[in-house]
Amino acid sequence: MSRQSLFTPALGQRKGLISHTVDLVRALLFDRRYFWHTAFLLFLGEVALSLLVIWKIPYTKIDWPAYMQQVDMFLAGERDYSKIEGETGPLVYPALHLYIYTAFHRLLPSIENVRPAQFVFLGFYLATYLAISTIYYLAGRPSNGGHHFPQVLLIPLTLSKRAHSIFLLRLFNDPIAMLIFYLSVIAFQIGGRKGWRLGCVLFSLALGVKMNILNFLPGLLVLLFQYRGIVGTVEGLSIIGLIQFLLPAPFFFSKSNPYLIRAYFTSAFDFSRQFLYEWTVNWRFISEETFLSRERAVTLLAGHLTVLGLFAAFKWSPVPGGTLRVLRKGFSDPLNQALEVSQVPAYHIPLVLFSANLIGMLFARSLHYQFHSWYFHQLPFLLYSGAGWGNMLTSVLIWVTVQYAWETAPSTISTSAALLAGHGAMVFGLFFHGMKRPSSSQKSKAK
């Protein structure tokens, strides 16, 4: 027997083992049947890493003391929202934010000892991961020309130093608002009358924590019209508006003074508030004078509305006949949905909402480091949906560029320019390489 023949079985077994391992890894990363297997493995890794972060890295004192000082004034009986303030300035967040941090104030053994609060925020962090995983999974349901969002997209969600810092070390309110928002997206994806109503309730609660949730509102308006019709849209907006009025009720009805109503809304939803140039992440490459100018604010608003209009007109109604057909159907039959659910893929709902938010980020007057949480968990979804120009290497390059800008502190001229370029590239990618509108002939063939 030759020497070569002696080793042939062993070599064959080794090749078989390698092939089996490659197949297993491929299945864990891309096969929909193993989506939750991979998601759970990553979840366990996040638990271990997050506990290590809390244990080893000191808490960063930024807004937590100010939140607690604002709560102290609220508990002391102050009901004029414009007079509630902390060491970082006046209270500029809606009422649910104040109630949540009041609960922290009451339940924690000491507001100076933030470690228990960090474990609560660890719960928020892990719940957010599970919520966004659910959104990706539901978006990948194989129906109506849809496609699977592979679980490999979940890996980047575990790689951000900035995300761990925002949730676990700084205890900002942004993660709370985003968690509630993601729960609303799941409700919208589940659908049905109850799903959309519950989604609107959750959306309004998220808005009751922080007004950045308004970035998603243009997309939600489009979706409500498409899935619920005119009457359903009015119903959804009424739910959102009613909750926004009920949340601050203790401030309105504590004294019969109409001024308190105006004081609340002008403080909690102050669209004219100036941002500090020293904290900007996305506009460091312009002068402070230009940064603070009214002309720049007006230009950004005009650009924001224009791009939203373009997406609403050409991208957010991916059915034969497009937006005009959806509008005609909606206005001719206001009691019913303006498009057939069977006409759009499962990823339509999160794609519209997330792209509306990305457009808002592109035209934001200023972004601070905690605002990273407004869209970090959405980036792999968007890049896979066209924001990466349909190319894996381009997607990776954009993701790395954007993350590098957020991880660099303080911001520099180059990192701000890179962040703006990354946002612009993603918006252009979504517009030119995103969801395609099927032609009537394609639709008929599909049938």
From Swiss-Prot:
Record key words, sorted: Endoplasmic reticulum, Glycosyltransferase, Membrane, Transferase, Transmembrane, Transmembrane helix
Catalytic activity from the UniProt record: an alpha-D-Man-(1->2)-alpha-D-Man-(1->2)-alpha-D-Man-(1->3)-[alpha-D-Man-(1->6)]-beta-D-Man-(1->4)-beta-D-GlcNAc-(1->4)-alpha-D-GlcNAc-diphospho-di-trans,poly-cis-dolichol + a di-trans,poly-cis-dolichyl beta-D-mannosyl phosphate = an alpha-D-Man-(1->2)-alpha-D-Man-(1->2)-alpha-D-Man-(1->3)-[alpha-D-Man-(1->3)-alpha-D-Man-(1->6)]-beta-D-Man-(1->4)-beta-D-GlcNAc-(1->4)-alpha-D-GlcNAc-diphospho-di-trans,poly-cis-dolichol + a di-trans,poly-cis-dolichyl phosphate + H(+)
Metal-binding keyword on record: no
GO molecular function list: dol-P-Man:Man(5)GlcNAc(2)-PP-Dol alpha-1,3-mannosyltransferase activity
A biological process term (GO) from this entry: protein glycosylation
Family: Belongs to the glycosyltransferase ALG3 family.
Protein name: Dol-P-Man:Man(5)GlcNAc(2)-PP-Dol alpha-1,3-mannosyltransferase
Taxonomic source organism: Cryptococcus neoformans var. neoformans serotype D (strain JEC21 / ATCC MYA-565) (Filobasidiella neoformans)
